[in-house]
């Protein structure tokens, strides 16, 4: 059994009683786990598996596949502020989508976990801005090795899109909404 800090990216139904849970972890990279019995009323996972939660997880690695068994979850930070505002939730979901596109499963990248943790910490306390989204994309492009701010003035999102073949479809509507929010904030001052 192995333990690591992790942020819950996505969860979906596997069976009547179990869930498949995707995590961005500090020690193992982005992984998928099966939470057996998580959908039962008296599950030890009850209240601990929600989107964007940070937790200390214990897993048993699978020898046959990339679907590991989740054995324990200790909630560290629910990032509750993200859920207080639709735009914060939308931005966090975009960050998760972007990470899922730009990373391979089970590829250890501690910088990626640290970036997502900082981003969620920011969204937990602040409303998102175009600048915050751009910073996240720039840092992700730097981690992926496709953007060096000193050498390139190019758009880091464009570099990520070229490397991985696409960007999340949610990017354009998110940026439009953030730009509209910024204009309305500036005009009310």
Residue locations for each model-derived region?
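Non-catalytic alpha-helical scaffolds and adjoining flexible linkers that form interface surfaces
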Residues: 1-189
